[in-house]
């Protein structure tokens, strides 16, 4: 076994050196791609997290358009943005989820990290560690424990997490609560006895800071396997894909509504939020740069006020301009920071920032031009706009998934994800700055 292990490592070193050599001229794909972020890029890490309070996409109808129609942990009917970015860059498949590779074993983890890369993204993650402790779509949650009536025997009690907007004009929270709860009640096999208590949703995820720690542990094993020079050279030519910040926008916007502050105070709060987010974001890039990263492909925040779950809170099904404005403000702050100080902060680094917000806005303004019939509702869910419940095996499913911008109440459909990734790779120049993902991948 010792001889075989040494032989395997020798072959792996040769493969790494070949990959590093052939990618230098830009004619082939990058040697690897390392992915960090939230549910828009998660390919299954959340499936391996313990506890009930974890956002997972490991049930039908998620994955219905994935090969063999299996739910993989992607919050999509098939592939997501990470998959299509990888495909566009020449990878046969997207880098696998870190937690699927037995992280304590140096065998498959290191081989994969050196040959194609690893995905560390986690649904629910934020730029700030505190984001994972909050509720998406609302800052207040009622935990409803539904127990079986006496006449029903041998059934398990169950719990629902019901989110209610505290203060969110012009939305009618009482009507929304009634619709949401009635729908969810029908989906669960539980009795009618209900007790309620207030509290925070303590969800579980892998925050960005922890994702970077996981990468550092991976890098240490890579260096041990092939040596510092080969590992450093490979990392410098690889692409580091980062897509995070949407959850921070959700949490901050709903919390701000709950505080009921003046316009001047809200502006001050937003400035402080942007400062914290930018500080953490650039600190993450700095850490990765110190570990060898040189090429950063960045997916900007989306038009979060227009996702179906937010639209469903409005009697008119309208977008929430306040949330969109908050997202646009952060996007602008990030652009300014990257354009102004990246070269000094990260010597030798290059980046491409994809304008997810702008691309989504253009698609929603004229969905038919992009081949969509429905740009407001979810394909999988229930209730109004199919967005008042999550995507469950007994959910209502749309007839043509490729004609929907959104898969569920918060995530893009597979087709929309493919359009976003293509626009960032070699699409119109207005969707990436200062260069495209393709130019980044092929840069020396």
Model feature map: region roles:
Residues 2-444:
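Conserved active-site regions of diverse hydrolases
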């Amino acid at each position: 076994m010792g001889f075989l292990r040494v032989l395997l490592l020798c072959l792996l070193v040769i493969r790494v050196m070949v990959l590093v050599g052939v990618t230098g001229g830009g004619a082939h794909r990058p040697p690897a791609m390392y992915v960090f972020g939230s549910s828009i890029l998660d390919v299954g890490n959340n499936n391996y997290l313990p506890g009930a309070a974890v956002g997972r996409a490991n049930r039908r109808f998620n994955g219905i358009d994935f090969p063999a129609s299996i739910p993989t942990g992607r919050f999509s009917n098939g592939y997501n943005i990470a998959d299509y970015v990888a495909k566009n860059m020449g990878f046969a498949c997207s880098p696998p989820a870190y937690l699927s590779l037995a992280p304590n074993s140096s065998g498959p983890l290191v081989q994969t990290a050196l040959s194609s890369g690893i995905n560390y993204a986690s649904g629910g993650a934020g730029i700030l560690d505190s984001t994972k402790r909050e509720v998406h779509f609302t800052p207040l949650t009622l935990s409803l424990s539904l127990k079986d009536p006496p006449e029903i025997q041998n059934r398990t009690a169950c719990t629902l997490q019901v989110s209610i907007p505290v203060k969110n004009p012009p939305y009618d929270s009482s009507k929304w609560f009634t619709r949401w709860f009635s729908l969810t009640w029908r989906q669960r096999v539980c009795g009618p006895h209900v007790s309620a208590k207030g509290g925070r949703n303590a969800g579980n995820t892998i925050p960005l800071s922890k994702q970077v720690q996981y990468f550092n542990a991976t890098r240490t094993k890579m260096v041990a396997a092939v040596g510092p020079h080969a590992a450093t050279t490979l990392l410098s030519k690889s692409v580091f894909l980062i897509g995070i910040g949407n959850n921070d926008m959700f949490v901050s916007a709903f919390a701000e509504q709950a505080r009921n502050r003046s316009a001047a105070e809200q502006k001050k709060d937003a400035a402080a939020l942007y400062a914290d987010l930018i500080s953490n974001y650039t600190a993450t890039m700095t850490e990765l740069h110190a570990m060898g990263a040189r090429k950063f492909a960045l997916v900007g925040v989306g038009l979060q006020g227009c996702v179906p779950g937010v639209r469903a809170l409005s009697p008119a099904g309208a977008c929430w301009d306040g949330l969109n404005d908050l997202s646009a403000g952060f996007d602008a702050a990030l652009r300014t920071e990257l354009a102004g100080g990246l070269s000094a902060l990260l010597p030798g680094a290059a980046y491409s920032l994809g304008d997810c917000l702008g691309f989504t806005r253009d698609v929603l303004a004229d969905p038919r031009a992009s081949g969509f019939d429905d740009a407001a509702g979810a394909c999988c869910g229930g209730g109004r706009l199919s967005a008042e419940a999550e995507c469950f095996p007994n959910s209502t499913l749309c007839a043509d998934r490729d004609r929907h911008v959104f898969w569920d109440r918060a995530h893009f459909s597979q087709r929309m994800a493919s359009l976003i990734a293509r626009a960032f790779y070699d699409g119109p120049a207005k969707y990436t700055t200062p260069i495209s993902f393709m130019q980044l991948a092929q840069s020396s």
